[in-house]
């Protein structure tokens, strides 16, 4: 299915990525390799990445399973508070992909683009910028719902 999605995006002239964890996860996985289809200039190229390619540890899916909204919020806040581990690595790696897709150099390979994105994702979390933005969104949401 991810190839069909990539073909549609290429036909529409979009640039970006479609990921599928080789363990069946619908995002970048820490549990082994991830198949990546890179779409650019109406062409599709295929690659595989592994968390280890970016200095991150592999981890089983069970290590990153969330829960209900409250549990997922708790996990997010703990990551933003500096907690290390598989959930943080999964968030950083998927954020790196989003950054690479949005701002990456189309001439560079996937690993180069994602490495640059990972540096920015780590900075956003470790500097407190991600937490600050989350707090702004929360305040805005509360303001809107109170109106």
Language-model regions, residue ranges each:
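Glycine-rich anion-binding loops and their surrounding alpha/beta cores
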Residues: 1-147
């Amino acid at each position: 299915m991810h190839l069909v999605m990539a073909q549609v995006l290429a036909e529409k002239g979009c640039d970006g990525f479609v990921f599928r964890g080789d363990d069946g996860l619908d995002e970048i996985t820490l549990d082994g390799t991830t198949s990546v289809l890179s779409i650019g200039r109406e062409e599709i190229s295929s690659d595989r990445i592994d968390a280890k390619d970016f200095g991150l540890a592999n981890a089983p899916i069970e290590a990153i399973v969330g829960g209900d909204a409250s549990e997922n919020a708790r996990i997010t806040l703990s990551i933003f508070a500096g907690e290390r581990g598989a959930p943080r690595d999964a968030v950083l790696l998927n954020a790196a992909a989003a950054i690479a897709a949005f701002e990456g150099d189309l001439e560079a390979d996937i690993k180069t683009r994602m490495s640059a994105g990972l540096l920015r994702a780590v900075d956003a979390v470790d500097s407190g910028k991600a937490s600050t933005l989350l707090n702004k969104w929360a305040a805005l949401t509360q303001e809107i719902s109170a109106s």
